[in-house]
UniProtKB/Swiss-Prot annotation:
Record-linked HAMAP family: NrdI
InterPro entries linked: Flavoprotein-like_sf, RNR_Ib_NrdI_bac, RNR_NrdI
Gene Ontology molecular function, alphabetical: FMN binding
Pfam families xrefs: Flavodoxin_NdrI
Transmembrane segments: none
Function: Probably involved in ribonucleotide reductase function.
Record-annotated disulphide pairs: none
One of the GO BP terms on file: protein modification process
Protein family membership: Belongs to the NrdI family.
The name this protein goes by in its record: Protein NrdI
Amino acid sequence: MKVVYFSFSGNVRRFIKKAEITNTMEITQNNCTEKIEEPFILVTGTIGFGEVPQPVQSFLDINHDLLRGVAASGNRNWGQNFAKAGRSISEKYQVPLLMKFEVQGTQNDISEFKDKVGQFNEDYGREEIQSY
């Protein structure tokens, strides 16, 4: 499954790179209004007091129908606003919040994320096979 991500400060980009996931797309100001054609998992940071970054919201306005899950990065110093963008997206679009991780994640976070993406790939494959 495609992993679409937004990295304001480079932390999420480093997380994705360490996870060695190849089917990815980085949301930027230049492509945030681009329509994609396949289901995806979103990974995003949180800005301000728990807000969804504007490029992510613009992307979701167009592509939310293909969103299957979300993971969020944040800083625990923000307390209850830690990775709040993930919770907001999960609630708004009724998709699972797969995980929250701090800054660029630990090795355990990366392993957990890879496992969850792998499970989505297996489940999505089964759905495709069963739909025949």
